[in-house]
Each structure stands twice: as structure tokens, then as C-alpha cells.
Amino acid sequence: MRQYEMLELEWKGAKPEGSWVDIDLAGEFSCDGIITKVKGFYGGDGIYKIRFLPERSGHYTWRIKGIIEEEGEAFCEKAAPAEEGSGKAAFEGTGHGMVRTRGMHFVYEDGSRYTPVGTTVYALAHQPRPLIEQSMETLSRSPYNKLRWCVFPKSFPYNENEPDFYPFEKKEDGSWDVHRPSMAFWEHFEGILRRLEDMGIQSDIILFHPYDRWGFCEFSMEENLVYLDYVLRRLSAFPSVWWSMANEYDMLMKRGMEDWYEMEEFIAANDPYHH
């Protein structure tokens, strides 16, 4: 266990009988009297996980509650000292923590300076595998240390293909079932996220957008919150993640400002690390 690097706990059990999102699994991690509460998630094939991002070094104890009852402890080693420089090569991997603000500037949690040099590849996760690999190779040789990309597929000129995976399974009537995340999709999405992290690239994840022909823009508020709940349970412990509520939010005509405020408040209340 090392400071700023995600800890993952895993258990095998029976498949959930109801929702695959709203599962009764949570953990409390304590160090020096500071307690962080996190929710677990279902990862498919009877696998349940809890992920935790230790932001300080020292002796940790934890208690798991819900469908799993367990206690544990471990010593978290201190991260290596911060190094000078802000180039991408200096920050490959996850050992510097999340990016925070300091005055008018950005810094990693270990105090290292972060100067964002970003680009967008909105439909990165939804392209054919050869194009994904070409894009990743290009990014690995680029100066970019921040990438904006989407959870939902994009319907737009040059992005007209059908993805191999979608974020959810479908119901018998053909509508999306937000309570049944597609594990193939989320494993695929995470694989890209981890590779970007290893390159020293921060992921500015766009949660909503209007470039849709599949019906994701038609979700009710209840469905949106279920979707966000799974995203937060599964991805919040990645130190390289940033949340971007939407691209061109004002083109999502079914959403008023109060809806956006509600979803923002939900994210703030359910992200234990406040990305």
C-alpha cells in the first residue's frame, strides 16, 4: 500500500438479485483519526470490489460493511519526494496524487507543479481497436498531459461507427437498463484510463454530451443518478480522474439548470476525494 496509489479489495460472491449498481457494500478507512467512507461496486462474474485512494501515509485500518463483513489493516508507505518539472515524462504513473489548485495554479498533491497541456479525443473508447491503438501510440509520443474523453458514444461527422460496447445492457423492450452496467464496456473503459495514467495523462471524463443517437440523452433524472452512482463507485479512486459534467450542456434540451445543479450536488456528495 503506497500513498497516492489506489488500493483495491476484492471478494467473490453471488450475483446481485436486483440492481447491479445500488449494492449494499461500503468501507471505512481510518488513518490518524481521519475516516474516509467509500462505496463498493459490482464488477461482474460474482466479483465485488472496494477501491480506496490513500492520500496520506501511515497506519490504516478499515472496516467493510454490508454484504461483506470484514476488517483489515496495512501500513501505507510515503510516496517518493516531489520532483521539479511539469513535463509529462516526469509524472508517468500515479505516485504524485490528484491534481489540486493552489492559488491560480495547479499542483499534484505531493506539491509537484502541474501545467495542463490538453487535447480532446471524445470518442476514444468507442472506436475500432486498431484506431484506439493508433491514438494511444500517438498520445504516448505527444506532449499532452491531459485528455478530455467521453463515457457515452458520440454521433458526429467522423464518429459514425457503432461501438463494440455500450455502458449498459438492454431490457427486453430494447431500452437501456442503467441498473445493469455492461462489464465488458467498463473493463474496456478502465483499461484505457489506466494506460493514460501510466503515460502521465490526466483524464477529464465528460459525463454527458448531446451528440447522441442511442437514447442516452433521453434518460430520466433517476436514471442519470443511477449512472452517476456507478461511475463514482467505480472510478473515484483513480487519482488521474477529473469530472466534466457535460460538453455543450445547453444543447441537452431536456435538462434545465436545476437538473445540472442536482447532478453536481450528487457528485460532490458521493465522491469521497472531491476530484
Predicted features and spans:
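Solvent-exposed, conformationally flexible loop/turn segments
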Residues: M1-M6
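Active-site mouth of glycoside hydrolases
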Residues: G95-H275
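Short coil-to-beta strand junction motifs in C2/discoidin
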Residues: S19-D24
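Extended acidic/polar, glycine-enriched regions
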Residues: E28, I34-G103
